[in-house]
């Protein structure tokens, strides 16, 4: 069981392995570790509630993007228009500035969780978007603080309506590439996402969880779960969640069409590791985006690149429940390995 891994011979082997290389992990780091049950946060978008896990992960970034986007009626433009891409990209840039400033282990940092998701804060951040031009640079906002690579996603559902949204990752490639003697598995390397700035909320400290990117999600309607989904791919994940929901809730696509539609990935700006990238960043688009849209986005100041490699744009899987019919619909990713199966 659990104790065999965290307190038994496996934990001793792992601790001895790191001691032999003068590493930072000790036996007590394993034996004292405890998983946590946490309450997800949510934002209502077009009458549906998206639930995401709170920091130290990046799930709240998807919620922040929707909190910003619900201040504009995207349906006044076609889904493939420059305007829709522009608003989504600028919302992403704003949310990711807050990732870099606030997202860390809440046991070690005061994080304005409620403030980040408030309607008032969403309106404030939306007001920073120029509808005609990409901003040269955004900074983090000031939400109110109350009380002063190798990733696998799986979703399953049973006949009773029980649904599970699960994601796990060793991070880059196969993780660290290090294997303790007699164990047969590689250590993950999520510690790469700590900041080495001691003043940063995400600073490297004993017993602390680093910022991480993996985020399973649920969509609810009137208090009932209707869709369990995820989209693998580092910083693409919250961007992908938002694009899937915009496709479905604003443009009426089904869950497979929502995943097949051409995506964007914006890369750049500040990072939770303390690294400050190009504030404008690069906007990667799939070849399916119309050429007219590409040229208009460039005219608006976005640094656009077309990338035909679908792997950059994430790996999507979903199950949607129709309670009235007592049935499910599944969706899978054409850009990566994935499948839908029923029993």
What are the functions of these language-model segments?
Residues 11, 71-170, 182-183, 190, ...:
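Internal maturation/activation junctions in enzymes
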């Amino acid at each position: 069981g659990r104790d065999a891994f965290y307190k038994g011979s496996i934990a001793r082997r792992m601790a001895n392995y790191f001691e032999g290389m003068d590493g930072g992990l000790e036996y007590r780091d394993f034996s004292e570790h405890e998983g946590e049950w946490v309450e997800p946060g949510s934002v209502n978008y077009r009458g549906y509630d998206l639930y995401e896990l709170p920091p130290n992960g990046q799930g709240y970034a998807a919620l922040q993007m929707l909190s910003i986007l619900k201040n504009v009626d995207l349906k006044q433009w076609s889904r493939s228009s420059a305007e829709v891409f522009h608003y989504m990209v600028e919302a992403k840039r704003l949310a990711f500035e807050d990732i870099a400033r606030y997202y860390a282990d809440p046991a070690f940092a005061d994080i304005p969780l409620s403030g980040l998701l408030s309607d008032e804060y969403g309106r404030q951040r939306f007001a920073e978007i120029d509808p005609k031009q990409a901003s040269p640079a955004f900074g983090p906002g000031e939400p109110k603080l109350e009380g002063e690579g190798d990733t696998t996603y799986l979703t399953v559902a049973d006949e009773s309506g029980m649904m599970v949204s699960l994601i796990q990752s060793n991070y880059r490639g196969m993780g660290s590439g290090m294997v303790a003697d007699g164990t047969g598995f590689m250590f993950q390397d999520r510690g790469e996402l700590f900041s080495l700035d001691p003043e940063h909320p995400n600073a490297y400290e004993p017993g602390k969880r680093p910022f991480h990117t993996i985020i399973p999600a649920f969509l609810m309607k009137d208090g009932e779960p209707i869709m369990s989904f995820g989209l693998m791919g580092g910083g693409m994940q919250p961007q992908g969640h938002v694009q899937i929901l915009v496709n479905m809730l604003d443009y009426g696509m089904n869950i497979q069409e929502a995943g097949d539609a051409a995506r964007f990935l914006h890369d750049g700006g500040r990072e939770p590791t303390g690294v400050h990238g190009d504030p404008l960043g690069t906007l990667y688009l799939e070849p399916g985006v119309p050429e007219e849209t590409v040229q208009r986005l460039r005219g608006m100041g976005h640094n656009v690149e077309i990338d035909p490699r679908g792997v950059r744009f994430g790996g999507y899987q979903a199950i949607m429940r129709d309670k009235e019919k007592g049935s499910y619909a599944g969706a899978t990713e054409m850009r990566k390995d994935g499948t839908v199966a029923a029993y």
